[in-house]
Every structure is written in C-alpha cells, then in structure tokens.
C-alpha cells in the first residue's frame, strides 16, 4: 500500500510549507536535496554490479534498455538520448521506454503504468534478446508496467536491474540486481519528481557514463567519441583533440577534417603519426580504447 512507502510519507520539516517564504522554501529544498548523494553512496556496490553487467552486454553486442512510467520513464528516455551525442553510439544501443509511448513524455497517459502486459509488449516491440540489459525504474518500487517488463526480460534470458527509492521495493524481487536509494519523504508529500527523481537521474548518469568508459568511449576524461551534431560540439571536438595531443588549433582542425570528424581517429593519427586507415585498424585491434592503441 502507498501509505507504507517512505516516498509517500509527510516530511516533518515542511508540514507548514504553505506558510513559508520563497527563501525559506528554497533553503529547505536545498537541505533535503543534500541528502540524496549520501543515500546513493550507500548503494554504490549495487550500482557497480549493474555497470559491470551492462559493459558485458555491450561487449556481446547487446543493448541497455531503461524502462519506467511518468518521471522515472522520462529520466530513462533523457539519459538514453544523451548517450548518442556524448558517446557516439547509435540510438539503438541505449534505449529509453516509457509507459504510454512517446506521447507520455509530455503528457500523462491514463492507466499506462498499471499494465504489466504493456511493459512486456514494449520489450517485444524492440525484439529483446538475452544479450540485452533491462533496467526498470520506479520511485515507488511497485509499478506494474515495470514489473511486467522485468519478468518478460528474465524469461528471455536478459540481465535485469531495478532502481527504486524505497527499501524492500516490490520490483527488487523481479530483478537480478536491485538498487534501492532510500530518499525518504519529499518536501511536497508524494511528489517523487523531487528527491527521488534527482536520485534516479544521478544513478542513471553513473550507469551510462561508467559503462561507456568501460567500452572505450573515453580517453583520460575526454569524450573521444563525441558526435559533432552542431557548431558547439564541432568546436568541442577540436578542443578535445588539442587536449589529448597538445596540438595547436590549426593542427587539430586539420586532423579533425582528415579523420572525417572522428575525434578518436584524429587523436590516434596524431599520437601514432599514422594515416586514417592505419589509425582505424589500430583502434579496431584495441577494441576502441585510445590508451591501449597508442601504447602499442
């Protein structure tokens, strides 16, 4: 029942929220938000297990699939979308599914989250395989849409994870790895878009970023597979080449163009004094890791 969930409890610090000034509201919100990273720190070992599993799936050609309803679903869609320009992956490698489909991203779809079959069908629609990793996201930890999806994922042999914001969450029993970030009562009772949503976003950031590092999408702390989809990212790409190689702007730009705007390839060309074709071959042998490529 909802009344037994910590995320549905009333926050004693904000019982009289409607009497507070804007300054006081912001102060108490900030104070409550500071508790989120502390809660996440307690479950880092579980997050690490998910990351290791995602890396393994990626190495087998599998995908990462986020799945949730409402705010939880939107956060998954957001993180999946950001992986494309940040890490240069295809939009099929990291997928975000939300109960009710794309329309639900901007408007609530009545009853969508209450259907287990809908969660199962959404995974069937993308032809889920045993090489994929499915992460169900639900602040309450009890969303039927997510539970249905996790059960189906396990039935086809896919790895599964669950992210919730309550202890002993129902969805935890339906996943291989459970991450329960206990964020407690919200300043606005039951509004899990607040601390719970913040916690979910931070955990998703960790999972996608650490997993991408694990498959060679990063050199040092640079986004070497960035997809230059606009002028800002084109300039960032050249700066990344400069940082990685200590080349000047003119040289970085020259190799950027010679590498057909592939930052990673340009870096290897400069650091190993090789042609684009040889750089691509070296990177392939090193499974895309720049550090391993240039150390050979």
UniProtKB/Swiss-Prot annotation:
Q: Which GO molecular-function terms appear in the entry?
A: carbohydrate derivative binding; carbon-oxygen lyase activity; ether hydrolase activity
Q: Does the keyword Protein biosynthesis apply?
A: no
One matching Pfam family: GKRP_SIS_N
So which domain of life are we looking at? Answer: Bacteria
Which parts of the sequence belong to the SIS domain? 54-217
User: Keywords on this record?
Assistant: Carbohydrate metabolism, Lyase
| Catalyzed reactions | N-acetyl-D-muramate 6-phosphate + H2O = N-acetyl-D-glucosamine 6-phosphate + (R)-lactate
InterPro entries recorded for this chain? Etherase_MurQ (IPR005488), Glucokinase_regulatory_CS (IPR005486), MURQ/GCKR (IPR040190), SIS_dom (IPR001347), SIS_dom_sf (IPR046348)
| This protein's pathway | Amino-sugar metabolism; N-acetylmuramate degradation
The UniProt entry's GO biological process terms, in alphabetical order, are: amino sugar catabolic process; N-acetylmuramic acid catabolic process; peptidoglycan turnover
**EC number, UniProt record:** 4.2.1.126
Q: Where is the active site?
A: 82 (proton donor), 113
Gene3D superfamilies reported in the protein's UniProt record = 1.10.8.1080, Glucose-6-phosphate isomerase like protein, domain 1
Miscellaneous section: A lyase-type mechanism (elimination/hydration) is suggested for the cleavage of the lactyl ether bond of MurNAc 6-phosphate, with the formation of an alpha,beta-unsaturated aldehyde intermediate with (E)-stereochemistry, followed by the syn addition of water to give product.
- Protein function: Specifically catalyzes the cleavage of the D-lactyl ether substituent of MurNAc 6-phosphate, producing GlcNAc 6-phosphate and D-lactate.
Q: How does it assemble?
A: Homodimer.
In the record, the note on similarity to other proteins reads: Belongs to the GCKR-like family. MurNAc-6-P etherase subfamily.
* PANTHER family per UniProt: GLUCOKINASE REGULATORY PROTEIN
- The identity of this protein, by name, is N-acetylmuramic acid 6-phosphate etherase
Q: Which organism is it from?
A: Listeria monocytogenes serotype 4b (strain CLIP80459)
Which classification does the entry list for the species?
A: Bacteria, Bacillati, Bacillota, Bacilli, Bacillales
Encoding gene, per UniProt annotation = murQ
């Amino acid at each position: 029942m909802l009344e037994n969930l910590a995320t549905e409890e009333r926050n004693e610090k904000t019982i009289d929220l409607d009497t507070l000034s804007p300054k006081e509201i912001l102060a108490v919100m900030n104070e409550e938000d500071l508790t989120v990273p502390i809660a996440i720190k307690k479950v880092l070992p579980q997050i690490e297990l998910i990351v290791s599993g995602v890396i393994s799936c990626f190495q087998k050609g599998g995908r990462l699939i986020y799945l949730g309803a409402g705010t939880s679903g939107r956060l998954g869609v957001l993180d999946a979308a950001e992986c494309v320009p940040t890490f240069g992956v295809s939009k099929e490698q990291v997928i975000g599914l939300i109960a009710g489909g794309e329309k639900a991203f901007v408007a609530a779809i009545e009853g969508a989250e209450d259907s287990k079959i809908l969660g199962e069908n959404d995974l069937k629609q993308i032809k889920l395989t045993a090489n994929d990793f499915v992460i169900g996201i639900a602040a309450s930890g009890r969303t039927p849409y997510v539970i249905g999806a996790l059960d189906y994922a396990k039935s086809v042999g896919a790895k599964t994870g669950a992210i919730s914001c309550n202890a002993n969450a129902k969805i935890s029993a339906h996943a291989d790895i459970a991450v329960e970030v206990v964020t407690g009562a919200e300043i606005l009772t039951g509004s899990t878009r607040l601390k719970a949503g913040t916690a979910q976003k931070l955990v998703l950031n960790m999972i996608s970023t650490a997993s991408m590092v694990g498959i060679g999408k990063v050199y040092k702390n640079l986004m070497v597979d960035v997809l230059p989809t606009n002028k800002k990212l084109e300039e960032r790409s050249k700066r990344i080449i400069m940082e990685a190689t200590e080349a000047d702007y003119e040289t970085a730009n020259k190799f950027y163009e010679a590498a057909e705007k592939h930052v990673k390839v340009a870096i290897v060309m400069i650091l190993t004094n090789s042609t684009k074709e040889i750089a691509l071959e070296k990177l392939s042998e090193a499974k895309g890791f720049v550090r391993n490529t240039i150390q050979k």
